[in-house]
Amino acid sequence: MIQLKVPAHSAMDNNIEAEWASSESYDLDTWTVFIESLPYVKSARFVFMSSFKDVSYTLITFDSEEHKTWFILRYS
């Protein structure tokens, strides 16, 4: 399972940079996140453009870390 943590402070930008962090053995660089609908809607879709293919993720929850809010996105 792949999960990405996206800083929520960039939520209203047209695109944001997602630095990851995977629990699996994937070598992920910084991916650009394109917001297809409002990010605070749980059904919002995020498309991560990589050098080899396009991968769609769905926002599943919110989390708080060191007083910063993150979007937790899981591969679907």
How does the language model describe each region?
Residues 1-57:
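Structured alpha/beta or helical-core interaction and ligand-binding surfaces enriched in interleaved
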Residues 49-76:
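Short, compact, well-ordered microdomains
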